[in-house]
Amino acid sequence: MKNIYWVSGLVLPFCSLQILKAEKQSNIIFIITDQQRGDALGCSGNERIITPNIDALAHDGYYFSNAYSATPSSTPARAGLLTGMTPWHHGMLGYGNVAEHYRYELPQMLSDCGYLTLGIGKMHWKPQNALHGFDATILDESGRVESPYFMSDYRKWFQTVALGKDPDETGIGWNDHAAATYKLNENLHPTVWTADVAVRTIEHYEGEKPLFLKISFARPHSPYDPPKRLLDKYQDIEMEAPIHSDWSKDIGADLTDPKADPTAAFAQFDDEYVKNSKKHYYAAITFIDEQVGRIVKALKDKGLYDNSIICFTSDHGDMMGDHHHWRKTYAYEGSSAIPYIVKFPKTLKTVKPVGTVVENPVELRDFLPTFVELAGGNVPADIDGKSLVTLVRDSLPQWRKWIDMEHATCYSEDNYWCALTDGKIKYIWFVHTGEEQLFDLVNDPKEMKDVSKERKYKKQIKDLRAAMVQHLSERGDGWVKDGKLVVRKKSMLYSPNYPQK
């Protein structure tokens, strides 16, 4: 039997099987954005950005200051979130297609624990209407159409309420570095639509089963197109100039005119142009922040806030012109560091007070074991992620030393790398060339100076190189031979662990 709820003009089927009583398990509200830098929140220490609602969530929970995306582009990052696995173990080493099915899938595992599992917004899976264990999804796929038979639910809705209008009227592409304000009524914007569906879902939630609700915003990924009223809030806020460094001084030097290549991955644009794009980007995040406020209010009005697990994160960051790089796929902080906030239910006993900043290195893979543990399920021993509960509940938590990161070739032949970081120091190995970089993030959080050749850091780079050898050794002689890292001339997009049909 199915109950039918009307959500933002769309029909959503909700399974109504009663497996477990909802009051015995906490609801899980998982909010994820697309391409949001880790420093693009007020609670990160950024005084230029306006995010009061997300900051309030951090005040009620925990802000994880050293959070990373292991493979910082959309699809492999989302595969890690879905499976709780490292890139090598879920199989995606760069930007490719999420597999149709995995042995471990977060929505299915929570469904097995008795949860109603619903996904709203951008999933970025293939096929695009795949469920991966969700009872239902309502999709906004940002204009991506990978089949002539697919149209996202947002686009269907847009056609019914804005007949004759163009949802892409702003005229900026999905990978453009330019920016402009949204040209239509802001209630037509996908950011509002995603929140509308989420709020109505919460309002109609009957509590027969505990709820896992994934709310996935397609912004602030380009197009950077906030409403003008929010851009106006930044009128008197001077944006920080893009980061320039000696090691990146020649990158993108052949391209200085933004109009010459609207989607350039490397360019040396004028600082004012970059600052304008960043201002729109920040305003787009403030737009999302407003929607987070609406979602939190709906939870409070329904009496669900206190006993819910509420998370806020992103799949990866956006370089925004730092070191003359744009978008993602890089090991540098702008691309790989992500926002990461968890508000646990009040019933969870913790040793760390709420509002604490947690410095242990965490990654998207850690959400799966966290949710499964709190849902009362069994976390498989071979899951790579670690439950975040350990970090707030235990006085002396056992935790990993490093986060491993990597990305197969993308945007340029030499952008093929593996990295290790704990948020304090970062080692990068360029797989095609054998070159190395080392950044002291404590003293140089903007990665201005590559210290890999400095005598002072000789021991650190030796130790990190050895740690990388250990990390990659399971991959065989093509990666590590005779205890040394192997330079690879051919990029590998999928590991042997990628599920075959």
Descriptions of predicted regions:
Residues 10-12:
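Core hydrophobic alpha-helical transmembrane segments of single-pass membrane proteins
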Residues 442:
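Residues forming the ATP-binding cleft of Hanks-type serine/threonine protein kinase domains
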Residues 2-4, 8, 20-430, 435-436, ...:
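Formylglycine-dependent sulfatase
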